Regions:
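Charged docking surfaces used in two-component/phosphorelay signaling
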Residues: 17-25
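Conserved phosphotransfer cores of two-component systems
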Residues: 44-47, 69-76, 96
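Active-site residues of response regulator receiver
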Residues: 55, 82
Length: 101
């Protein structure tokens, strides 16, 4: 059985490593992106991504922009994993189509 592929997007390499290690141990295949622009490029290059775990505050393209771009063409599940914890941020995430915040 083929492993599900998860795209982990965060500009902090330590956070990506922490999430990746947890997911790999759970049996998932993990691809990393260090900024929003790389995330979009990777998503469209890899046609079999099953889930995106996405930070908000990143260089080049923030998580909100990434979500808008991907939601134009895909319903892939997106989980926001971010330090932005205000209610308005969470509401914006759900308005943009994230599945969990």
């Amino acid at each position: 059985m083929e492993k599900l592929k998860i795209l982990v997007v965060d500009d902090e390499s330590r956070m990506r490593k922490l999430v990746k290690d947890f997911l790999v141990k759970a049996g998932y295949d993990v691809i990393e992106a260090g900024d929003g622009e790389q995330a979009v490029d990777t998503f469209y290059a890899q046609k079999d991504i099953a889930l995106i775990i996405l930070d908000v505050m990143m260089p080049k393209m923030d998580g909100w922009q990434v979500c808008r771009e991907i939601r134009q063409n895909s319903k892939v599940p997106i989980i926001m994993l971010t330090a932005k914890s205000e209610e308005r941020d969470e509401l914006l995430g759900f308005d943009l189509g994230v599945d969990e915040y």
